[in-house]
Amino acid sequence: MNIKMMLLCLASTSCWAQKDSVNSLSVDLNFLSHGEVCGGGLPKPDDKDDYTEDRSSFLFGRTRLIVDYGRKGLQAHAVIQNSAIWGMKGNQALNLYEGWVKMTAKNGLFAQLGRVALSYDDERIIGTNDFATAALSHDILRVGYEGHGHQAHAILAYNQNGESVYSNTYYVNGAQYYKNMQTVWYHYDVPTIPLGASLLFMNIGQQSGDPADAYHHPSTKYQQMFGGYLNYHPKFLTLEASYYRQTGNQVDKYMGYIPIRAWMASAKATVKPSECYDVELGYDHLSGDDYIPVNYGGLNMVRHEVIRGFSPLYGSRTKFYGIMDFFYESAYSNGFTPGLQNAFAGANYKPFDKFTCSATYHYLAVTTKLHELDRTLGHSIEIQARYQFSKGISLSAGYTQMHGTETMARLKQDDSSKLAHWGWFSLVVSPSLFTTKW
């Protein structure tokens, strides 16, 4: 009888201890192996002759060590990241991709401090851009409230190139893209209908100047981004729309600053008749700079009195304007942005649980009126597929082909007579190493 009572007490104590566990710790790994083969579509470098081939292939690896700690009211998260091209000697990018602590109160208030991978709405303006080799993160303080369908966030950032008691300089070659940044984001989910709405305001300070020039002190210029995003998703249908404006001033090495007057709008509809497939249709319009003719084959850098070319800032561009990202990742040869019209249609198909595939067509054109040139840049077709082997192991692959026009050749200083193509694959392995609670 005494033995039975002791066993019962031990069992109940064990259950109580498991129920009362307040701390959790997990350690995970994430391996990404990525390969690309591409050709065509890029400007010819000035130091290359006309016979230089525009093609390349490479393999890339990224490893992440992910540590998570949590208890009631407190979270801590760290991601150490190494990324490099296979065969590269030295200069491998080993950094802290994320490292933050977050404190949460019972009433929904929270404060988060550290290096954070930010993602808002559809990631058009602020996203992780995880398809890129190193992805994006920001050193910030974020405070806010979340509850009852409301989300309100305020973000503050202040960056330095290094510790100094003599100056407060931060130039554009720093780890981040700005000297300081203030952002306010608000989102509301309507309880009676499947509608979500967001508002965003950003104030971004960029510093100009020459660190070696003691006579010209650094100057910080500010630009603003503000707008909204809507998502309406009744049964079988999702409607999305966004509109943003850019104002303020852009840092310029020679002129000090240039005023910004730019805007963008987008709309997208997705119909999902079944769990196996969906179709989508959409249009993006990004404003462009005034056109100034340039001579074919020369740089002829253009200086505008007003910047009218919209910049997606810190968004995940490959999600929207074609996965090759011809138009914002690689600059136009004469230094101006002619804007972009992107009309697209696509379909996603999931024949069984572990496999998905998609195909998308893009019609691409500039928004700026050009002299003696048509606005059409070209036509692009993208095919992608993904197979989930097991939990934490997946393989993705894709192929894109674009046929550029004479307009594309003139603005990018490339050869429009040949097809631009890009093939890629990504193998992701994410094992969970350790999980415990106490």
How does the language model describe each region?
Residues 1-19:
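Bacterial Sec-dependent N-terminal signal peptides
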Residues 17-114, 141-145, 230-242, 246, ...:
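Beta-barrel outer-membrane channel/assembly domains of diderm bacteria
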Residues 39-46, 87-94, 123-130, 164-173, ...:
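Outer-membrane beta-barrel translocator domains and adjoining extracellular loop/strand segments
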Residues 42-46, 80, 117-125, 155, ...:
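Flexible, solvent-exposed coil segments and beta strand-coil junctions
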Residues 55-56, 131-133, 174-176, 218-219, ...:
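Short Gly/Pro-enriched turn/cap motifs at secondary-structure boundaries
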Residues 56-163, 187-191, 269-315:
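Outer membrane beta-barrel
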Residues 151-242:
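Internal metal/ion-chelating core segments
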Residues 246-346, 410:
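Extracellular/periplasmic loop regions
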